[in-house]
């Protein structure tokens, strides 16, 4: 395994040899095959949803500068998308605002980001602060919660050629479609911000769904293949209990750099801290 790991960067170089970066239009055309490959062969593509979204909302926050709602959208008959939508007050009729879709880390809830009564040491209510600044914000629930419960879902999906992100991608697609229908939303300015495990979403989902206008990966961007498979690297997932990380032949096709190439030419940003524990400083 370690010998294959050392050769992976050269396999990726051969794999990407048909991408042409001579200009933006050529790049877009020649990387479509890689976006399709990532979705079909690495993440695993679920059929497009056929059910109506049937949006349901419930008022949960009344703040001085914004109002908050719990939102539920149907994706499949037994799969739904859930999150908290914060809408700034004072939006004039006909005015449209940009949106930030936000994602927390492992074992989190949207309330960890949006509830002003919770001051999580990693998040510090940043979703509420964005709403106070005038952004529409959607903090969504991801299925990586429940310790081994969600990891069992991953292992059940893998023999079918699927992964947890197969469902996450379709949930995001449904959320983007619904957000674009809201009269106060500027649908071509929906951005994504993910932190920690949420940044695994920031790498994969905007690479596949071009409706996101930009992506920010916070506290996760890495030499991802080594981090997953190295037997010697002190930050390797081989030394943790997060055994669900591995993806289909990822090392020979996509590292985090290559995923970010699929976001290009849309803006992409990396945030990291000197002491965030992601990689050696």
Where is each model-derived feature located?
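Active-site glycine-rich loops that stabilize anionic/oxyanionic intermediates
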Residues: 76-77, 104-109, 196
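Alpha/beta-hydrolase fold nucleophile elbow
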Residues: 184-196
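Glycine-rich nucleophile elbow surrounding the catalytic serine of serine-hydrolase chemistry
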Residues: 194-206
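Conserved hydrolase catalytic core segment
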Residues: 207-213
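Cap/lid segment of the alpha/beta-hydrolase catalytic domain
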Residues: 92-181, 226-231
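Short beta-strand/loop motif that positions the catalytic acidic residue
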Residues: 263, 270-272
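Non-catalytic accessory segments flanking enzyme active sites
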Residues: 7-87
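Mobile cap/lid helix-loop segments that gate and shape the active-site cleft of serine hydrolases
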Residues: 167, 214-259, 274-281
């Amino acid at each position: 395994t370690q010998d294959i790991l050392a050769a992976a960067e050269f396999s990726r170089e051969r794999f990407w040899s048909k991408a042409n970066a001579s200009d933006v239009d050529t790049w877009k055309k020649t990387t479509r095959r890689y976006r399709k490959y990532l979705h079909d062969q690495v993440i695993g593509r679920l059929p497009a949803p056929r059910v109506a979204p049937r949006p349901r909302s419930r008022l949960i926050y009344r703040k001085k500068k914004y109002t908050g709602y719990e939102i539920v959208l149907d994706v499949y008959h037994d799969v739904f998308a859930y999150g908290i939508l914060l809408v700034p007050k004072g939006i004039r009729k006909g005015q449209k605002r940009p949106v930030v879709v936000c994602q927390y880390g492992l074992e989190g809830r949207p309330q960890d980001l949006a509830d002003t009564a919770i001051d999580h040491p990693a998040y510090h209510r940043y979703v509420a602060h964005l709403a106070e600044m005038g952004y529409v914000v959607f903090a969504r629930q991801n299925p990586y919660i429940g310790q081994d419960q969600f990891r069992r879902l991953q292992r059940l999906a893998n023999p079918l050629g699927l992964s947890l992100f197969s469902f996450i991608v379709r949930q995001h697609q449904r959320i983007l479609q619904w957000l674009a229908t809201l009269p106060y939303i500027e649908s071509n300015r929906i951005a994504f911000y993910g932190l920690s495990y949420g940044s695994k979403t920031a790498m994969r989902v905007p690479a596949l769904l071009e409706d996101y206008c930009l992506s920010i990966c916070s506290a996760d961007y890495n030499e991802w293949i080594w981090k997953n498979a190295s037997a010697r690297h002190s930050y390797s997932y081989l030394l943790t209990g997060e055994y669900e990380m591995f993806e289909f032949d990822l090392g020979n096709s996509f590292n985090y750099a290559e995923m970010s190439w699929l976001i290009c030419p849309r803006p992409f940003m990396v945030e990291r801290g000197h002491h965030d524990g992601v990689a050696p400083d």
